[in-house]
Every structure is written in structure tokens, then in C-alpha cells.
Curated annotation (Swiss-Prot):
Protein name: Ribulose bisphosphate carboxylase large chain 1
Residues that bind Mg(2+): K206, D208, E209
Gene: cbbL1
PANTHER family per UniProt: RIBULOSE BISPHOSPHATE CARBOXYLASE (PTHR42704), RIBULOSE BISPHOSPHATE CARBOXYLASE LARGE CHAIN (PTHR42704:SF17)
Cofactor: Mg(2+)
Residues at the active site: K180 (proton acceptor), H298 (proton acceptor)
SUPFAM superfamilies given in the database record: RuBisCo, C-terminal domain (SSF51649), RuBisCO, large subunit, small (N-terminal) domain (SSF54966)
């Protein structure tokens, strides 16, 4: 979109810095001829201007309010290198098929952000600008982070490859389950659930996001019973096992204390929740790196700002920030389960976690190429309303480098927890075997599972119980550039 000359940036210094109010594009925040530098951070915003607000002016306002501008001209601008410090909106396009919404591309000089700080970057990009009155709504859809800035972050403390080496498990997805019910179990009963799941063939068990240290179960009791279960299951199966011990707490001091105790007990992995905040996440990443412990991130709270398509932050952006911040696992959706997730969009999240270079892929919501500069890869986690009868879909969608977590799909098994774990492990092994033999598991999957169930009573019971269960709702966050195919 091009605007007439009277709306162009004012170059006369006297006029530009005269006291009063100027349009944002006149102050230099709209630069349609700007070519982003390799060292620029580029953000794609979805903006919905108020009625009567020009979309170019709205884009310029986003650039201004997320970098150096305020509502009026200030004389102290002349004490800075304004041309470097101003963010630059350089392109605006209508969102396909959605009247009143626009995509705005905004470039930020690398000098605007503190090295290795997600908190500082987000204070600019999703700070006051999201409350700006001339906008009905704004959403950060995607971000291109320059290699020069990526290199200021340490990234995942363990990474996908080293995690597999530590666990000695290759060529298949990892299996997990969340202990249920989330709240109310005693420490001893909690440990019994963990043992049964791991003994039945799961690689991991897991605390849920809201189990910390409540009156019915102190965190120290849980850790002791859980690690006793992990050690016994490892001895019984000959496999390395783990259970995500949630160290989320009210203060960093409490979190460090819990993490240290988990390490002393021999846990290979600890867990944190997204709600602890970006600074706490980076702090726990540093701890995990120093102590050779895998760091699992539950994305608790993300749906409050990622789910709505017109306002907030896309989860693909959160996934990028978390890879920089340094987590080894992150929940990324299932597409076929109970939680929000369009199949192609969710695949885009997985690409962000696992690629060395994430390529632009508009049908999957990826607007930019992203070079990760050899930053370690994150293991995506699929969790929420999945069961053994969907194994072919999950492997077809997400491949091997994923943790498939069947909480209710393990612990709700009619024959018990261990039987539920057996059902999931057999379903996984038969599907991987069929895939490796060259079979079309997407289409032949149900038949492959039925044949395997002839020799595995727990799998047969799982298919009989949940085989017809699906969550067929229209996702709210879908690609603007492709019709998403069904998951069959």
C-alpha cells in the first residue's frame, strides 16, 4: 500500500522535531522502500484498525509504539540515533478473506534488544502496543530472528539428539503419560501410578501443570515415591525410565531447591510451567545445563493469548522464543486430541522445534525462513485426549522425534494402568514396524492395529473402549493461505 506524499516521513529537521503531534508515518515509522538487513528482527503482525484508521498509519503506529515513539514529538529524540532505533513498518497487505484485518511487516534493528533476553525482546514486541486504542486487535503472527541475535542465546540444555543418547532409545517416538487425577492423590498412590505406567512400557510419566506442593501431597513426598517407582520400573524392564518432576513454585529459591532434590534422587528430567515467566524459564534452563538434567516445559496458560486468531501471540512465536530460552521439551499440540490445534498449523510448530533451518511454509503458518544457527533441537510433546487407536495418525503427522503422552488413554484403561501402558507400547511398536516395512500407515493403520490386537488383549480393550472417540471441532487458529485437509 502506497500513501500520498503528504503522508511521507518528514525530512526537514525543524518541522520533524517541532513540538506537537505528528502521524506515525510522518515521524519515520513507515518506510515502504526499506529492505530489511540480515541482522534485523522481522515481525509479522495481524492488525485490526479501528473504523476510520488507515491501515498504513496503524502499521506505523505498531512500529513506533513497539520501539521509540510516544504520542507526541519529544526533543530528546535528537539526542539519539533515531534512524537506527526506530522500528520500520515496510509492508502492509490485507489478510486474505478477512475484511478489516491486515498483515504488517515491521523490522527492528538488532541494537534494540538486550543480548540473550526473551524478557527484553518481548517487552518491546508485545508490550504497550497491544493496548493501543487505534487498534481493535493485534496479533504477533510470526517472527524472523536474525542469526546474530540467535547466537546470543544458549538454547536447549540437552537437546533432542543427546536426550535420545542418554535414554538409549532410537527409531521411534517416545511414550509418556500424565498421572491422573491431576490433584488429590497421596504421595504413595501417586508413586504406584508412576510404577504401573513405566512397568507397562512407557518411557516417561509426568506431573501435570497444577501439581506443585499442596496439602494432600507435599512436593518432597511426591519426589521420593516417584523416584522409587522410576528405579523399580527401570530395574524390572531394563530400560532407562523417567518422570517429569514439576519444580514450579512461588519463588526461584523454591524452584532451585526442588530441582536440586530431584537431581539428588537421580531424576533425568524436571518440569516447569510456562506461567513462571520468561526470566524464570531461562534461569531454570541455566540450572538444567549445569546439572545435565532434561528440562520439560508445560505450556500452561498459553491458550489465554495464542488461541484467538485476531489478538495475542501465535504459538509458533512462543515456540521460537522457548527454543531460544532453552527448553528440551515443549507441548506443541496433537491435532487429533482434545485441545485446540489445526493439523497443518501444528506441524508448523513442530518444524520450529526440530528444524536446523525452518523454511517459509505459508500453509503451515510459517512466514519466514528461520536459521537456527546450530541451536539444539527441542523435542515436541503431543498430549491431550489421545489414545492407542490414533497411533497411525500421530506417527504420520509428527514422525519419530516426538513424545506421545497418553494420560487418560493409559490410566483410564479398563484393565488397569499397566494394561493401558502395554496397549500404547504395542500400538506404537506395531505401527513403527509396519512403517519401516513400507506400508501406508495413514490408510492401513486401523487394520494394522486390529491385527496386532488379536495377540494383545490390552490393545484390543483399548480399541474397543476408545476406537470411535474423536474430538471433531473446527480449530480457531488456521492458516490464512490454505484449506486444511482432514485428518483421516
Amino acid at each position: 500500500m502506497n500513501k500520498p506524499m503528504e503522508d511521507a516521513a518528514i525530512t526537514d529537521v525543524k518541522k520533524r522535531y517541532s513540538a506537537g503531534v505528528l502521524k506515525y508515518r510522518q515521524m519515520g515509522y513507515w518506510m515502504p522502500d526499506y529492505v530489511p538487513k540480515d541482522t534485523d528482527t522481522i515481525c509479522l503482525f495481524r492488525i485490526t484498525p479501528q473504523d476510520g484508521v488507515d491501515p498504513v498509519e496503524a502499521a506505523a503506529a505498531v512500529a513506533g509504539e513497539s520501539s521509540t515513539a510516544t504520542w507526541t514529538v519529544v526533543w530528546t529524540d535528537r539526542l539519539t540515533a533515531c534512524d537506527s532505533y526506530r522500528a520500520k513498518a515496510y509492508k502492509v497487505e490485507p489478510v486474505p478473506g478477512i475484511p478489516g484485518q491486515f498483515f504488517a511487516w515491521v523490522a527492528y534493528d538488532i541494537i534494540l534488544f538486550e543480548e540473550g533476553s526473551i524478557a527484553n525482546m518481548t517487552a518491546s514486541l508485545i508490550g504497550n502496543v497491544f493496548s493501543f486504542k487505534p487498534l481493535k486487535a493485534a496479533r504477533l503472527e510470526d517472527i524472523r530472528i536474525p542469526v546474530a541475535y540467535v547466537k546470543t542465546f544458549k538454547g536447549p540444555p540437552t537437546g533432542l539428539v543427546v536426550e535420545r543418547e542418554r535414554l538409549d532409545k532410537f527409531g521411534r517416538p517416545l511414550l509418556g503419560a500424565t498421572t491422573k487425577p491431576k490433584l488429590g492423590l497421596s504421595g504413595r498412590n501417586y508413586g504406584r501410578v508412576v510404577y504401573e505406567g513405566l512397568k507397562g512400557g512407557l518411557d516417561f510419566m509426568k506431573d501435570d501443570e497444577n501439581i506443585n506442593s499442596q496439602p494432600f501431597m507435599h512436593w518432597r513426598d511426591r519426589y521420593l515415591y516417584v523416584m522409587d517407582a522410576v528405579n523399580k520400573a527401570s530395574a524390572a524392564t531394563g530400560e532407562i525410565k523417567g518422570s517429569y518432576l514439576n519444580v514450579t513454585a512461588a519463588t526461584m529459591e523454591d524452584m532451585y531447591e526442588r530441582a536440586e532434590f530431584a537431581k539428588e534422587l537421580g531424576s533425568v528430567i524436571v518440569m516447569i510451567d510456562l506461567v513462571i515467566g520468561y526470566t524464570a524459564i531461562q534461569s531454570m534452563s541455566n540450572w538444567a545445563r549445569r546439572n545435565d538434567v532434561i528440562l520439560h516445559l508445560h505450556r500452561a496458560g498459553h491458550g489465554t493469548y495464542t488461541r484467538q486468531k485476531n489478538h495475542g501471540v501465535s504459538f509458533r512465536v512462543i515456540a521460537k522464543w522457548m527454543r531460544l530460552a532453552g527448553v528440551d521439551h515443549i507441548h506443541t499440540g496433537t491435532a487429533v486430541g482434545k485441545l485446540e490445534g489445526d493439523p497443518m498449523t501444528v506441524q508448523g510448530y513442530y518444524n520450529v522445534c526440530r528444524d536446523s533451518v525452518t523454511k517459509q511454509d505459508l500453509p503451515r503458518g510459517l512466514f519466514f525462513d528461520q536459521d537456527w544457527a546450530d541451536l539444539k533441537k527441542v523435542m515436541p510433546v503431543a498430549s491431550g485426549g489421545i489414545h492407542a487407536g490414533q497411533m497411525h495418525q500421530l506417527i504420520d503427522l509428527f514422525g519419530d522425534d516426538v513424545v506421545l503422552q497418553f494420560g487418560g488413554g493409559t490410566i483410564g484403561h479398563p484393565q488397569g494402568i499397566q494394561a493401558g501402558a502395554v496397549a500404547n507400547r504395542v500400538a506404537l511398536e506395531c505401527m513403527v514396524k509396519a512403517r519401516n516395512e513400507g506400508r501406508d500407515i495413514k490408510n492401513e493403520g486401523p487394520e494394522i492395529l486390529r491385527k496386532a490386537a488379536q495377540f494383545c488383549a490390552p490393545l484390543k480393550q483399548a480399541l474397543d473402549t476408545w476406537g470411535e472417540i474423536s474430538f471433531n471441532y473446527t480449530p480457531t487458529d488456521t492458516s490464512d493461505y490454505a484449506v486444511t485437509p482432514g485428518v483421516a
